């Protein structure tokens, strides 16, 4: 599943590539991809004549702020756009990704949503396993209330609210493993299996440790490790092990730099001991028994 760095990579690509993109036509190739409104016709009508004004990210969700455009001959850059048209929210889930196409390329087998501007440039959403979802939240409704998972997210790892004091507060009485805690999106948004493993390795903390046993200095180190690992991955365009692609169709390169994730049986880059794998909270967990205590 695309995690924070992959979703942030997509967000940056969308923001750069879709500057001044006004939706003229929407084609829904798979109805189940549209999570809200329940009728695809309302989803299509809601998006038409909307400017993809600004792209944000919250955890693993992409959120596009929409502006209603009535005049096709509007001139850019736009200084004042007063008529909001709600939000387009996207969750890529396991295998979803976007591709920008500036010609009449036929849709591939796994194309789920097609969005066109008046020049017939296309933003294509492709999803092999079809778990990804999209929501059009009309003006006046709150995305946090419509989308349960969005409203329950914990703080962003890069935010001021995510520090050792916050971590100490949320884990002080928890018997769960620190790995399971990091995967909990209500505690911290955007971290998945890859970056939980890599962050714990960087911090020298065993993924099996009960969260409540982590000391203050370790929490400080863990917070810094999380931020540094995420930044490094974003700088590498995220991680591709199977389906993830950026807007240009390129793979992420962080997978070549991982220290423990998917390196079972290989030598630890620090100590030379072999990397091990075991399941925690139903997820494959990779760690170095010598470097992580």
UniProtKB/Swiss-Prot annotation:
PROSITE patterns: FPG_CAT, ZF_FPG_1, ZF_FPG_2
GO biological process terms held by the UniProt record: base-excision repair
GO molecular function: 8-oxo-7,8-dihydroguanine DNA N-glycosylase activity; class I DNA-(apurinic or apyrimidinic site) endonuclease activity; damaged DNA binding; zinc ion binding
Swiss-Prot/TrEMBL catalytic activity: Hydrolysis of DNA containing ring-opened 7-methylguanine residues, releasing 2,6-diamino-4-hydroxy-5-(N-methyl)formamidopyrimidine; 2'-deoxyribonucleotide-(2'-deoxyribose 5'-phosphate)-2'-deoxyribonucleotide-DNA = a 3'-end 2'-deoxyribonucleotide-(2,3-dehydro-2,3-deoxyribose 5'-phosphate)-DNA + a 5'-end 5'-phospho-2'-deoxyribonucleoside-DNA + H(+)
Residue positions of the active site: 2 (schiff-base intermediate with dna), 3 (proton donor), 60 (proton donor), 283 (proton donor)
Textual note on the cofactor: Binds 1 zinc ion per subunit.
Binding site for DNA: 110, 129, 174
Pfam families: Fapy_DNA_glyco, H2TH, zf-FPG_IleRS
The keyword Zinc is assigned to this record: yes
Organism lineage string: Bacteria, Bacillati, Cyanobacteriota, Cyanophyceae, Synechococcales
Cofactor(s) the record lists: Zn(2+)
Keyword terms: DNA damage, DNA repair, DNA-binding, Glycosidase, Hydrolase, Lyase, Metal-binding, Multifunctional enzyme, Zinc, Zinc-finger
Function: Involved in base excision repair of DNA damaged by oxidation or by mutagenic agents. Acts as a DNA glycosylase that recognizes and removes damaged bases. Has a preference for oxidized purines, such as 7,8-dihydro-8-oxoguanine (8-oxoG). Has AP (apurinic/apyrimidinic) lyase activity and introduces nicks in the DNA strand. Cleaves the DNA backbone by beta-delta elimination to generate a single-strand break at the site of the removed base with both 3'- and 5'-phosphates.
Keyword DNA damage: yes
Record's subunit section: Monomer.
Zinc fingers (FPG-type), renumbered ranges: 259-293
EC numbers on record: 3.2.2.23, 4.2.99.18
Protein name: Formamidopyrimidine-DNA glycosylase
Similarity remark: Belongs to the FPG family.
């Amino acid at each position: 599943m695309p995690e924070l760095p992959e979703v942030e990579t997509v967000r940056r690509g969308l923001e750069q590539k879709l500057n001044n993109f006004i939706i003229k036509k929407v084609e829904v190739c798979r109805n189940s991809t549209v999570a809200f409104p329940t009728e695809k016709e309302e989803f299509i009508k809601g998006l038409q004549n909307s400017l993809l004004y600004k792209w944000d990210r919250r955890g693993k969700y992409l959120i596009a702020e929409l502006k209603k455009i009535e005049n096709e001959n509007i001139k850019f850059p736009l200084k004042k756009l007063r008529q909001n048209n709600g939000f387009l929210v996207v969750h890529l889930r396991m295998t979803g990704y976007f591709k920008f196409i500036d010609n009449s390329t036929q849709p591939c087998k796994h194309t789920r949503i097609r969005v066109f501007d008046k020049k017939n440039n296309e933003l294509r959403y492709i999803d092999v396993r079809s778990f990804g979802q999209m929501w059009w939240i009309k003006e006046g409704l709150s995305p946090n209330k419509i989308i349960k998972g969005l409203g329950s997210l914990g703080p962003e790892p890069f935010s001021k609210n995510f520090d050792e004091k916050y971590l100490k507060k949320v884990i002080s009485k928890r018997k769960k493993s620190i790995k399971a805690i990091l995967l909990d999106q209500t505690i911290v948004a955007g971290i998945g299996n890859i970056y939980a493993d890599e962050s714990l390795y960087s911090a020298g903390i065993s993924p099996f440790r009960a969260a409540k046993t982590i000391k203050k200095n370790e929490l400080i180190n863990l917070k810094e490790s999380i931020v540094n690992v995420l930044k490094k991955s974003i700088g590498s365009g995220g991680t591709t092990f199977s389906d993830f692609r950026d807007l240009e169709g390129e793979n992420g390169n962080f997978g070549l730099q991982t220290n423990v994730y998917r390196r079972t049986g290989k030598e630890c880059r620090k100590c030379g001991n072999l990397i091990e794998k075991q399941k925690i909270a139903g997820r494959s967990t990779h760690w170095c028994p010598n470097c992580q205590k």
